[in-house]
Amino acid sequence: VFERALFYDRRDRPPFFDLDGFPLQRIELSPGNLEDAVAASGAIPLVLAGVRGIEGTARGVYRDGGIIDYHLDLPHSADEKFTLYPHFFGHIVPGWFDKKLKNRRPQPHHIDRTILISPSDEFVARLPHGKIPDRRDFANFEPAERVRAWKQCIAACDQLADEFLEVVEKEQLAARLEPL
């Protein structure tokens, strides 16, 4: 039996905290479980091992939410708050199975207080193979080529992070915002 796990910060519960469409275990983030919770959120089934023994959780294996949790068309923010959403792409497609449907978009009132941070198309085009590394790289490239490309992308992303910090420190973020 699968059960969802929502790790949350008690100071700021997400607007979807009380959803009940699937069995849901709610776990408060703490210094003792933060690292394991982040590791579990990236543990892609059949690719990376799940995480066991996370402090404050029921027994079991914790891993990436997969099909039911990718880009749900739900409100991202409470009315008076904003959500900062780092993402690979400059758009959000609700529904994991619909990600190839380029015209599918979330309901506007679900993302009207979302600040999406993503690399530009020009940045991605300059990366090795003109794309962001993904799990298909394991099948498409030999290990040495895959590692080389991933390291180049990490270096490029370090520069991107430095640029973002500079924009924030100089209070230039508002000038860079575009409507979703």
Give a label for each model feature:
Residues 1-180:
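Patatin-like phospholipase
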